[in-house]
Amino acid sequence: MFGKLSLNSIPYHDPIIMITCCVVILVFLVISIIITIAQKWQYLWNEWCCTVDHKKIAKMYIFLAFIMLFRGFADAIMMRMQQFLVSSYHGNGTGFLPPHHYDQIFTAHGVIMIFFVAMPLVIGLMNFVVPLQIGSRDVAFPFLNNLSLWLTIFSALLMNVSLGIGEFAQTGWLAYPPLSELQYSPGVGVDYWIWSLQISGIGTTLTAINFLVTIIKMRSSGMNWFKIPVFTWTSFCTNILIIASFPVLTVSLLLLTLDRYLGFHFFTNDFGGNMMMYVNLIWIWGHPEVYILILPVFGIFSEVVATFSSKELFGYTSLIWATIVITILSFIVWLHHFFTMGASANVNAFFGITTMIISIPTGVKIFNWLFTMYRGNVRINSIMLWTIGFLITFSIGGMAGVLLSLPVIDFSLHNSLFLVAHFHNVIIGGVVFGCFAGITYWFPKLFGFMLSEKWGKRAFWCWFFGFFCAFMPLYALGLMGMTRRLSQNINPQFHSMLTIAALGTILIFIGIVFQIIQIFVSIRDRNLNRDCSGDPWNGRTLEWSTTSPPPFYNFAVLPIVQFRDSFWESKKSFKSNKLPILYTSFHMPKNTKFGFLIGFFAFLLGFSAVWYIFWLFFISFFVIIYLLVIKSLDTNCDYIISIEEIKEIEKCINIKKMD
């Protein structure tokens, strides 16, 4: 009845896992008791679980990302400590993690940081900012937005269930065959990996469709393509990449599923299977994924640099074309991830050259931002510190990437810690720093008060120096010959560098602690740091023309755009920032429970597939189909906001401003 699932599926023998699970269960129980005492279950269900408001959905994406960041960073600390101990002359020769546990940790770390930290951060910021920047009241398909969120949350939950029930994959975050095939990974770890990513990937694809339609069809009157803010432009290109690449991931996972469940031979070593086909397919998705993460971050820095330099963005048109070129080129560089596969010299040369070429439009952006700051009235705060930190770290990571684009060098450095350092250089120095800058920048608009500058700067310096301590030694270790994913028998000569890397990880941890303190201090002092103007940074784009936080309908009157920086131009010409008092009634979407329910049954479907509980699998599948049909037949999905209601809400907002 329960397939492979039994009491033996719980790893009682592993104290680290059991203690972690007990702590998680205890925290969950404490939170549940607090919510019950406060009688907030109904509120959470109606206002958050069922919401279609893009601003609330954005908050939940960002909250999910930070929760998963703690899990992913805990994995990182354990890996660093394991390598530090094993490489020690006098330390524990085997460390504290057995190889099978270490392999699960580095696999989970990669999956969490890409799929459940970086992606939710980027999608959360897109969710909040894009509709406001284009002068829209919501996204094109509010229900899809809610559904995408819950598919992402429940896929993250499914992955975390593997911590206490069964195991996670021991294959690396991309699960290369034949190691991920049933013959070499007969446990449920790879199945957890497949179904978590499959559910999450479907949610991400739906998000991309939603935002493409939103940007194309719901822009303000007068906002043509070259009046769109850069962040929205980069989000547009990102969603094109998602639509083009994520179906490849879906198909790759489906083929691997058929191999494991039905005995097919797409990627096996026998019966005509070809594991290199999988490697090509996964990287046709995987390399655009890097640009899916970094392009919105480029948009964030474009907004930040222009605002805090008090200047129009230098080379707006060249920035847009550079973004488009990167979007196109990102699909013709994937083979540089496996120059050692055995392709011909001509094939390797082609992909090496395209990899070098893609650095050109990226370099254009760097110079655009530098020239924007040049002779500008630059205000240095924590947001600009994240930006300057990005310019330094990302440039180093980019140069390392160009070095790796040379096949002759890649043959020596492939699968070494040099590659790990490069990857973290661009993801942490680029994506993470950028998202922190964006969250700090738009935090007043999101919550109505500003974050503490003092703690924000402290957090930045810990992250900045911690990053260099943690990852610069890995470049040297890679050149010295240390390969990635080692947990045993590490050369003691590497110990000094691994010690510095471990200290850097601790510094980053202190930075995370400072960020937690920053949030608590900011909440405590929120009345002192409240944003009553709606424009705390003297911004340039439309999101700053509404209140902080915006009302649920964003704009009582939809703006009309005449300039590229329309709000900035209106302030320059001494026009009032208040919107005209000429209201009309409009439709707003109703909250819906269907997104949560479909996400929940998708979780059950994935869990039952992992454990071969086929009766539950088919029940979950048909319930999902039933819910989709019922929702598609529902015509009562919106309501009208009357002129009187708008006037009353705007009156209350104005009173709060004066208070």
UniProtKB/Swiss-Prot annotation:
Topological domain ranges for the Extracellular compartment: 1-14, 78-109, 170-192, 257-280, 340-350, 404-416, 481-499, 609
Molecular function terms from GO: cytochrome bo3 ubiquinol oxidase activity; cytochrome-c oxidase activity; heme binding; metal ion binding; oxidoreductase activity, acting on diphenols and related substances as donors, oxygen as acceptor
UniProt-annotated location(s): Cell membrane
InterPro entries according to UniProt: Cyt_c_oxase-like_su1_dom, Cyt_c_oxase-like_su1_sf, Cyt_C_Oxase_1, Cyt_c_Oxase_su1_BS, Cyt_c_ubiqinol_oxidase_su1
Membrane topology, from the record: Multi-pass membrane protein
Transmembrane segments: 15-35, 57-77, 110-130, 149-169, 193-213, 236-256, 281-301, 319-339, 351-371, 383-403, 417-437, 460-480, 500-520, 588-608, 610-630
Residues holding Cu(2+): H287, H336, H337
Cross-link (1'-histidyl-3'-tyrosine (His-Tyr)): H287-Y291
Signal peptide from the UniProt entry: none
Ranges in the topological domain labelled Cytoplasmic: 36-56, 131-148, 214-235, 302-318, 372-382, 438-459, 521-587, 631-659
Keyword Translocase (UniProt): yes
Chain positions recorded as Fe(II)-heme o binding sites: Y291, H414, H422
CDD domains registered for this protein in UniProt: Ubiquinol_Oxidase_I
Homology family: Belongs to the heme-copper respiratory oxidase family.
More about this protein: Ubiquinol oxidase catalyzes the terminal step in the electron transport chain.
Description of how the protein assembles with itself and partners: The cytochrome bo(3) ubiquinol oxidase complex is a heterooctamer of two A chains, two B chains, two C chains and two D chains.
Protein name (database record): Cytochrome bo(3) ubiquinol oxidase subunit 1
Source organism (scientific name): Buchnera aphidicola subsp. Baizongia pistaciae (strain Bp)
